[in-house]
Amino acid sequence: MKLTNYVQEVSLADFGKPFHHKAYWNKRLKTTGGRFFPKDGHLDFNPRMLEENGELIFRKIVRHELCHYHLYFEGRGYHHKDRDFKDLLAQVNGLRYVPTSSKSKTNHHYSCQTCGQVYQRKRRINLSKYVCGNCHGKLIEKNQS
């Protein structure tokens, strides 16, 4: 998919306005669907949003970034907090927030021997140092299956 051409098509179809700058894929984006750069007008998009969520959701992400783009160049409020932005986003049916990834990001699972409270962590914890926050019972690491 030629990203800049796709963004130009979405801009004309959904906004009735041309997109005059470039759009790029940015693999370094982790928690966001895209970014608008007011300094030079280009847009960055997260390729995983297209892979994980499909073209329908990705089109809504493109609309979101184009709201920033068009409002900025019209001299209107282009930030998330601005009424102009919220109104235009609702008008074109863009996404306000990016859908969360279905992939689990927790690597370590612990449970309390006494009360059964479950803890999920990205980083390993020292079981001789930490105890359950509920009952101060001993924690054990659960096996991943």
Swiss-Prot record:
Its cofactor is Zn(2+). The active site is at residue 65. Binds 1 zinc ion. One of its GO terms (cellular component) is cytoplasm. The keyword Disulfide bond does not apply. Zn(2+) binds at residues 64, 68. GO terms for biological process: response to stress. It holds the Pfam family SprT-like. It is found in: Cytoplasm. One of its GO terms (molecular function) is zinc ion binding. SMART domains: SprT (SM00731). InterPro entries: SprT-like_domain, Uncharacterised_SprT-like. Its main location: cytoplasm. Keywords: Cytoplasm, Metal-binding, Zinc. Residues 4-140 form the SprT-like domain. Belongs to the SprT family. This is Protein SprT-like. It comes from Streptococcus pyogenes serotype M18 (strain MGAS8232).
